[in-house]
Amino acid sequence: MTKLEISKPKFGELTQIASDLYWAHFELPFRLNHVNLFLMDTPSGILILDAGLKSDHSEEHWEALINGPLKSKKFAGLLITHYHPDHIGMAGWLQDKLNIKCYTSEKELFTAKTFRSMPDDKYADIFRNVFVRAGMSCLLYTSDAADD
């Protein structure tokens, strides 16, 4: 295996990691503090791999890329790898902004639609149960303890 000597891209920049593959690094406003997005140069144009979290910061980052290193590029589409909000959140914005199609698997589309239509507390219960089954403590925080 060859170790690549590459630097993390800064805001509004792309890092080329192969002849036809580029890396974008978007900050996130929570503990998982970033998401890596990739762009592939194809014969049909740039294929965006994942969209980023729906946020003002992501929109500003995409605007900087679109008006900067991607300014003269044609876009082939958007491929969403999985339903997590930090990967699918900006999909609609990118589709509208770039007039491109979005591609994902039926399973990921179904999962995204299911979770999006679910109340926040139900969504939280599902993930709490997943983490507890994986060995996490059931009680992570109680608001009563904050007053002590």
Enumerate the language-model features and the residues they cover.
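Conserved beta-strand hairpin/beta-sheet module of binuclear metal-dependent hydrolase folds
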Residues: F11-K73
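Conserved small/polar residues in nucleotide/adenosyl-binding loops
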Residues: Y141-A146
